[in-house]
Amino acid sequence: MPSFDTVCEASMVDVKHAVENTTKEITTRFDFKGTPAAIELKDKEITLTGDADFQLSQIEDILRNKLTKRSVDVRFLDKGEVQKIGGDKVKQVIKVRNGIETELAKKIQRLIKDSKIKVQAAIQESKLRVTGAKRDDLQAAMALIKKDITEVPLSFDNFRD
């Protein structure tokens, strides 16, 4: 029975390279000289450190540009709150989304059921598997998901015929 998986995964290699390129640019830019401006990637969290909110926004802008150049959708980034870490330094943690949240998976599942396309959607941990009898039905389901779900960057993997 034909099937495909709907996933929400960023290429962590490209994210790592974008963070490294951002670090290089921070060290060479004149307006960041002598400041504690830094960016760091640990697991799936990017930590921005700087003197003020304005500096954090500049670092984030550089990061977004580098991610865009590497074809990583910036909707993968989930910004946290700006925290004061002593003195006049601030930091912000940005999480890189990986996997479809349960709430979104249920929304997609409901969307597919309501569309009356002859496919079934099953939630499997951080992805959503869609199965159907015909390949055309699966392609219609893909088109429906792409059209209606725009808040997160979804991709389709593991298409089996």
From Swiss-Prot:
The family database entries (InterPro entries) matched by this protein are listed as: DUF520, UPF0234_N, YajQ-like_sf
Q: Does the keyword Nucleotide-binding apply?
A: yes
- Give the CC-aspect GO terms: cytosol
- Specify the superkingdom: Bacteria
What Gene Ontology terms describe what this protein does at the molecular function level? nucleotide binding
SUPFAM superfamilies (alphabetical): YajQ-like
Pfam families recorded for this chain? DUF520
Which keywords does UniProt give here?
A: Nucleotide-binding
PANTHER family, A to Z: UPF0234 PROTEIN YAJQ
Role played: Nucleotide-binding protein.
Q: What family, per the record?
A: Belongs to the YajQ family.
The name this protein goes by in its record: Nucleotide-binding protein Rfer_2692
Taxonomic lineage of the native organism: Bacteria, Pseudomonadati, Pseudomonadota, Betaproteobacteria, Burkholderiales
